[in-house]
Every structure is written in C-alpha cells, then in structure tokens.
C-alpha cells in the first residue's frame, strides 16, 4: 500500500491538504499504540509500526517537494538523498546572484523593506516552479519533474536563508 492509498487519496501531485490532515488524524487515532496496550505483543508491535508508517507518509505527502520526490520514486526515478549536481547553469547563476543580493540587503538603506521584497520574489519563484512541476508530473515528464524538484530544493534553501536573515534583522 503506497502513501496515497494509506490516506485514501488519489495518486496525484495535487491533493486536498484538509482531507490529508483529517485522514491523518483519523488514522493516528485508530492505530495509536495506547489503543493496543492490552493486546498481544505482536499486535502492539504492529500498531507501533503502523503509527510510524502513518507519520512518515503524512510528513512525505504534506510537503509538495517530498510529495513529488515520492511520486517520482514510485515511477522508478528515486532522487531522494541523491547528490546529483544541478545541470542548469542559468538557474545556478541566478541562485548565486540571489544569494549575493541577499547578503547585500543588510547594507541597504531599508533592509526590512528590501528583505520583504526579496522574500516576495523568492515566493513567486517557488510558486512558478511548483506550477511547472505539477504540469510535468501530470504529463509524466519524469526527468523534467526531477529537475524541477532539484530547483525547488535550491529555492527552499534560499527561503531558509531569508528566514534566518529576517530573524537576525527583527530579533
């Protein structure tokens, strides 16, 4: 049983987050190890394993990047944990420039406003890349989708750097 089947969801990238959360809570309640406290050792062990499977599946499906990685792995294109280098030099150059711009924000006349604008730009990039990824997965363009996932990981790392700088400025 794959992660989508576990939650009774269609096996597709686009999913209803509210339904995923509701199904997660229901399954978590049903298979919670406390419900099996008086059961046999075997049943207690099975409930712990099932609870772990439910938690793992939920963590995977709730994040679009890990959900896409999971879909790709189900199609024989497992890129989770890979160390493949990005093959798109223009994208890499853009990422380097964005990181330089982020560093330069601290010395701007209004760093908070500049950071807000920068963050909006990164969010727009992420949204665009997610839309591309959705199309690629729907069209079963697995290699292109894998490349989009790699790009999203770069964008997400950049977003984390934005959040760190935000904490530094506002903290």
From Swiss-Prot:
Belongs to the HscB family. It comes from Aliivibrio salmonicida (strain LFI1238) (Vibrio salmonicida (strain LFI1238)). GO terms for biological process: [2Fe-2S] cluster assembly; protein complex oligomerization; protein folding. SMART domains: DnaJ. GO terms for cellular component: iron-sulfur cluster transfer complex. Residues 2-74 form the J domain. Co-chaperone involved in the maturation of iron-sulfur cluster-containing proteins. Seems to help targeting proteins to be folded toward HscA. Interacts with HscA and stimulates its ATPase activity. CDD domains: DnaJ (cd06257). One of its GO terms (molecular function) is protein-folding chaperone binding. SUPFAM superfamilies: Chaperone J-domain, HSC20 (HSCB), C-terminal oligomerisation domain. The keyword Transmembrane does not apply. Keywords: Chaperone. The keyword Transcription does not apply. Pfam families: HSCB_C. This is Co-chaperone protein HscB homolog.
């Amino acid at each position: 049983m794959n992660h989508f089947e576990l939650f009774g969801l269609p096996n597709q990238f686009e999913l209803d987050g509210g339904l995923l959360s509701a199904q997660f809570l229901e399954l978590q309640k049903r298979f919670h190890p406390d419900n099996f406290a008086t059961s046999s050792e075997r049943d207690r062990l099975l409930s712990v394993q099932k609870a772990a499977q439910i938690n793992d599946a939920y963590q995977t499906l709730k994040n679009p990047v890990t959900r896409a990685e999971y879909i790709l792995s189900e199609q024989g294109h497992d890129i989770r944990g890979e160390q493949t280098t990005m093959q798109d030099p223009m994208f890499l150059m853009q990422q380097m420039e964005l990181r330089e711009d982020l560093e330069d924000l601290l010395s701007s006349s209004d760093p908070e406003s500049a950071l807000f604008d920068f963050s909006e730009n990164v969010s727009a990039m992420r949204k665009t890349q997610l839309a591309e990824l959705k199309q690629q997965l729907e069209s079963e363009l697995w290699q292109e989708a894998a490349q989009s996932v790699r790009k999203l990981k770069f964008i997400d790392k950049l977003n984390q750097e934005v959040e760190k700088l935000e904490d530094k400025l506002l903290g």
